[in-house]
Amino acid sequence: MQLYLVLLLISYLLTPIGASILGRCTVAKMLYDGGLNYFEGYSLENWVCLAYFESKFNPSAVYEDPQDGSTGFGLFQIRDNEWCGHGKNLCSVSCTALLNPNLKDTIQCAKKIVKGKHGMGAWPIWSKNCQLSDVLDRWLDGCDL
């Protein structure tokens, strides 16, 4: 029990100040305002679905992929080995900039990624959870854009 409390306290202390999960409609509005609705032919619903399955709408999310050793950053879990930081840095952005809750750098980098030959298929989680979904409309239910 003591170990559990210590681990809980440590995880609380390591949570970045100001880190918060964004609401679904907040994410939709920010992505819409950032010009992602039908960008390269992909509806806003696809982008919101991707954001949910990649980060659960957490713009501060950082997850390491144990399979390839890369780390994903931010709302869309953009990988450091190719798109940001010290890797190929095809987005010309620091990985930590992708953790900003204003999503400006995240949206600009996502636009570069989706312009590539794979489109949104560059995110395998989108292909698995969003691409063939017949309920994409639900991602914008009740959102005032």
From Swiss-Prot:
Q: List the disulfide bonds.
A: 25-143, 49-130, 84-95, 91-109
Highest taxon listed in the record's lineage: Eukaryota
The cellular location(s) given in this protein's UniProt record come to:
Secreted; Cytoplasmic vesicle, Secretory vesicle, Acrosome; Cell projection, Cilium, Flagellum
| Molecular function as annotated in GO | lysozyme activity
Its subunit composition reads: Monomer.
- Main localization category: secreted
Q: Which Pfam families match?
A: Lys
Tell me which species this is from.
Mus musculus (Mouse)
Q: Which residues form a coiled coil?
A: none
Q: What does the record give as the function of this protein?
A: May be involved in fertilization. Has no detectable bacteriolytic in vitro. Has no lysozyme activity in vitro.
Q: Which InterPro entries match?
A: Glyco_hydro_22 (IPR001916), Glyco_hydro_22_CS (IPR019799), Glyco_hydro_22_lys (IPR000974), Lysozyme-like_dom_sf (IPR023346)
Q: Which UniProt keywords apply?
A: Cell projection, Cilium, Cytoplasmic vesicle, Disulfide bond, Fertilization, Flagellum, Secreted, Signal
Which GO terms of type biological process are on file?
Answer: fertilization; single fertilization
In the UniProt entry, which residues are flagged as the active site?
54
Query: Signal sequence span per UniProt?
Result: 1-19
Tissues where this protein is expressed? Expressed strongly in testis and in epididymis, and weakly in brain and lung. Detected in sperm (at protein level).
Q: What is this protein called?
A: Lysozyme-like protein 4
Which residue numbers delimit the C-type lysozyme domain? 20-145
Write out the GO cellular component annotations.
Answer: acrosomal vesicle; extracellular space; sperm flagellum
Q: Which gene encodes it?
A: Lyzl4
Q: What does the similarity note say?
A: Belongs to the glycosyl hydrolase 22 family.
